[in-house]
Regions:
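Charge-biased, low-complexity intrinsically disordered regions
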Residues: 1-200
């Protein structure tokens, strides 16, 4: 079973997703995309300040390195659509926008070891990002496995990215969410990721 630990003063929620059947983007997810878009138009999304405060607490300027939730929010505010990647990543992006909480997703068959750690990156640490050449995490909040960092609240790594081959994954909310949000996460993962969810 997945274990996620930290020695930092951060509140997070982690889930292990298993028996997944990730597919290409699904047409029947358009309702959730519309819900996220409507939340932005109506201003009913979560508190954008929570993720910014998390970054500032660890010395990162959130106006220069934006949390993923805010980057997605800004995309929608500019009239652009949410990126469609696959059935599981699409769920994470939609919930991240609505809740305004950064979400990390990691393929556990690609991660090394039985444990993920939320920590500060050391000087010079980084990884190849998804669609990015290099992501520097030195001095920044990151997620690491036994060989090094594989994600952070702004951008995950290509090494542990979710694909249609993913059968087991870690889902991390980098801020607390409500019990209703947890239930909704499990529901959407079951419907669109065709998988099961347990707390890590």
């Amino acid at each position: 079973m997945l274990k996620v630990r930290t020695d930092l003063d951060v509140e997070f929620l982690a889930f292990e997703l298993y028996e997944l059947e990730v597919t290409e983007p699904r047409e029947d997810f358009e309702l959730e995309i519309a819900r996220a878009t409507q939340a932005v138009r109506a201003g009913t999304f979560g508190d954008i300040g929570r993720a910014r405060a998390l970054y500032r607490r660890f010395g990162t300027d959130p106006t220069r390195t934006r949390p993923s939730n805010e980057a997605l929010l800004r995309r929608l505010k500019k009239g652009n659509a949410l990126p469609r990647v696959n059935s599981l990543v699409d769920v994470a992006n939609a919930l991240s926008v609505q809740l305004q909480v950064p979400v990390g997703l990691y393929d556990l068959e690609k991660a090394r070891g039985d444990e993920l750690t939320i920590r500060l990156g050391t000087e010079g640490e980084g990884y190849s990002g998804i669609g990015k050449e290099h992501v520097n995490v030195g001095g920044r909040l990151c997620v690491a496995d036994s060989v090094g960092p594989c994600g952070n609240p702004s951008a995950d790594s290509a090494r542990t990215m979710i694909t249609t081959e993913t059968e087991r994954a870690a889902w991390i909310y980098f801020l607390p969410v409500t019990d209703d949000d947890i239930d909704r996460t499990a529901e959407l993962v079951a419907v669109f990721g065709r998988g099961l969810v347990r707390m890590a």
